[in-house]
Structure formats: C-alpha cells, structure tokens
C-alpha cells in the first residue's frame, strides 16, 4: 500500500513496490475511499475496499495484539517516531471499539491495554551492553509470543523490529502483519527472510519499500499518519525569525549539521529531543551551544507541537536514508516550512509549496535551503499535510489490511463473528 510514486503525490499501492503492472489508486485524505486494491503474492491476491471508516467492515470489535519494540516506553514524551506511531495506532484502534492488547516495555501508557513485559531495554553503546540487551529482548519476546499464542487474537500487528516474533509466528493461529519502520538490519532481516513467502509486510514509505526489495520482493506500503489536531495549524510564527530542529539527538539524525546550517543562514536555532547518545552530545553538540543555539529539552507532544508551530522554518538533517520523515510531516502540519537533506522518503513528502531540499550532508546547501524555505506560504504547508498524513486514513488502511488478512487466514468462529459472517 504506498506512499509516493512521484515527488508530488502519494499513492496507495498494494502489490510489488517494484515490478510489473501494480494496481495503483490515488488516495489522498480528501478523496473518497472507494478504491479497489489488489496484489500479487504467493498466497491468494488481496482484494479489499476502503469505506469512509474502514471499521465498518467489522460487524463486531476485533481482538488485536500489537507487539511494540521494547527499547523505550510507548508513552509521552515519545523517544521517536516508532513510539509515537505505535501509541497513535493503539489509541485509534481502541477508539474505534476494537479490543487492543499492547505488549510493550514498562512505563508505557496503561490505558492502551498494556501488558508490560520488561523494563525498557534502551540502546547499546558497546559490545557488553549489546549482548545484555539482546538477551533481555530475546527472553521478553519469547514471553510475548507465548501470551499471543494463548490469547485468542484475531490479528497480530508486529512493530517489534525483532526477528523472534517472526520466527515464532507459525505458532499463533491469528495472522500477523509486520510493519517495516527502518532499513534492513541484522538480525531482523533473518526473521523477515524466514517469513517473506507467507506474511504481509508493510513499509512506511515507498523509498523504504525499495530498500527492502533486496530481501523482500513484494512489500506493501502504508504511509504513516499524524494527529492533525495535535499538530495544529499556526498561521503566524512567533517572535524573531528562528529555526527549529527536533528528533533524537544521535549521529544519524545530524543535529550538529543543522546547527551549522542555521548559523550559515544567519538564523538562531532551538532544538529539542532526547539525548540518546551521551558521547555524541558531549563531542558534537555541547561545543556548538551558544546564544544563538538553545536546547529546549525533551518536550511533551503538546509543547513540541507549539514550538514547531512558532518557528519560521524547520531543519531536517538526516545522515541516513530517512524511512519516513515524521518530523517533516509534523512541521508542515503546523504550517512551518522545511529545509531538509533530500534523503530517503523526504523528497516524497516535500514539494515546492512546503519545503526546500538540499544536497545530502552539504551544510552550505542546507543553509541556502533554510533561507529559501522561510518565505514559503504556511497555509500551503498545512494543505500538503492534510492531503498526505491524516492519521485516520492510515488507521482505515490498517483496518482494511487486517480484514483482508483475517479473510485469508484459516477460518475460525472468532474471525467470522468479527467479520459478521457467523
């Protein structure tokens, strides 16, 4: 199911991300959701329709297991885009009446149907911590899969980025859908390869699907959505002209390059996010702080949206192929134009109405992009976000996929009741 076959539009594509004659249909947030979807896979082709709210496809609530990754809690303030995505999806599905159980780490939001399986495992910075985390996560995902196998679920949504749920999926009667949020990495790839022939995988952008095509020839694409009410439109920036950068403060996000680019453009910069890599902070960020560069801390969702909406421009400086670009989507939803390195999915999000792209890792070119982006029309930014990133549409698409997977799974009375067929 995809996002963007061109720089200027997002498509829904169910079928190979690359290959012959994929069935495509433009599905913007403002377009009637009546398209027919089809795909070619080893198992029977999926044919499903989008209703104004796809939850109407279910006669009764569905019992859904969501397997989160365990490194950080699924709670505000979010450590990153995956935590926010998992939180919103669980919340939205529960709001639609489904019975959601979220398997996640301690500290996650309790009213999401939480089953807390371990303390947050965090990120590794050396071989010893990596080995410790690997062991903790393996034991935790074993416990999760034991519970899922006994839980009587209709569908399992796997957001874990861990191979073990994939390798044990055959032990579960319910079908599993696995979302791809990152480029291929070991050992997750081992699990994906093991189930590539008989499981549905959905990447969060077309560019990410293309990266996975080397090991997974037919990934679907379901683009991420954002809460357009939380990231509300702000027609006028606040205060003196300034830029903002948000995200995890880690080398692959490149905040040190954003600082240098803002200075090159002559704009003060404020930035926010968790200090996820102390060594990187001490060596590359702390020495760059000054009167024109201010660290705001790790902000709540509401405070983050307010500060983004007040800014004159957002910088996005990834040093990897950005799988989706959630920061970009949130910024334009607030009406704040974006200057960004043209990496990964970002060129699929930004067009000339809402952002300016720069050459990857080129600080001077990013400074140029900052100067040009400041003058873009804020309402055009918001309209672009509304067209591409309505989270309710994302939820519709996942519901439609769940329904199709349940239809093609081994029939059970529980599935039939949920679909209104018993």
Question: Where are the predicted features?
Answer:
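Catalytic cores of nucleotide-sugar-dependent glycosyltransferases that transfer UDP/GDP/TDP-activated
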Residues: 21, 28, 33-40, 44, ...
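N-terminal, intrinsically disordered, basic low-complexity segments enriched in Arg/Pro/Ser/Thr
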Residues: 8-17
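Short alpha-helix boundary/capping segments
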Residues: 1-8
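Short, composition-biased linear "edge" segments at structural boundaries
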Residues: 14, 22-23
């Amino acid at each position: 199911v995809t996002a963007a076959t061109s720089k200027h539009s997002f498509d829904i594509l169910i079928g190979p991300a690359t290959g012959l004659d994929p069935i495509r249909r433009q599905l913007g947030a403002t377009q009637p959701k009546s398209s027919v979807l089809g795909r070619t896979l080893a198992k029977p082709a999926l044919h499903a329709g989008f209703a104004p709210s796809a939850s109407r496809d279910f006669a009764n609530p569905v019992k859904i297991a969501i397997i989160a990754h365990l490194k950080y809690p699924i709670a505000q303030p979010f450590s990153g885009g995956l935590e926010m995505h998992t939180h919103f999806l669980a919340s939205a599905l529960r709001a639609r009446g489904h019975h959601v159980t979220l398997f996640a780490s301690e500290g996650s939001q309790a009213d999401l149907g939480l089953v807390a399986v371990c303390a947050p495992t965090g990120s590794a910075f050396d071989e010893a911590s990596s080995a410790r985390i690997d062991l903790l996560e393996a034991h935790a995902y074993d416990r999760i899969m034991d519970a899922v196998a006994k839980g009587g679920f209709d569908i399992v949504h796997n957001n874990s980025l861990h191979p073990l749920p994939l390798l044990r999926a055959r032990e579960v009667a319910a079908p599993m859908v696995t979302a791809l949020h990152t480029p291929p990495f070991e050992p997750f790839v081992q699990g994906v390869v093991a189930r590539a022939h008989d499981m549905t995988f959905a990447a969060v952008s077309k560019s990410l699907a293309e990266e996975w095509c080397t090991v997974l020839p037919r990934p679907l694409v379901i683009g991420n959505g954002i809460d357009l009410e939380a990231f509300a439109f702000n027609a006028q920036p606040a205060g003196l002209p300034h830029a903002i950068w948000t995200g995890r403060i880690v080398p692959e996000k490149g905040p040190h390059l954003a600082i240098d680019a803002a200075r090159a453009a002559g704009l003060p910069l404020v930035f926010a996010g968790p200090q996820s890599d102390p060594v990187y902070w001490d060596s590359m960020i702390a020495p760059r702080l000054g009167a024109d560069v201010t660290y705001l801390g790790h902000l709540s969702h509401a405070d983050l949206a307010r500060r983004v909406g007040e800014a004159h421009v957002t910088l996005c400086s990834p040093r990897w192929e950005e799988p989706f670009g959630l920061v970009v989507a949130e910024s334009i939803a607030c009406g704040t134009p974006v200057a960004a390195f043209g990496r990964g999915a970002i060129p699929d999000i930004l067009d000339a109405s809402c952002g300016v792209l720069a050459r990857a890792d080129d600080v001077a070119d990013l400074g140029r992009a900052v100067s040009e982006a400041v003058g873009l029309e804020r309402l055009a930014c918001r309209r672009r976000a509304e067209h591409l990133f309505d989270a309710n549409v994302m939820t519709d698409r996942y519901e439609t996929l769940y329904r199709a997977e349940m239809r093609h799974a081994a029939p059970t009375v529980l599935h039939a009741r949920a679909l209104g067929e018993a």
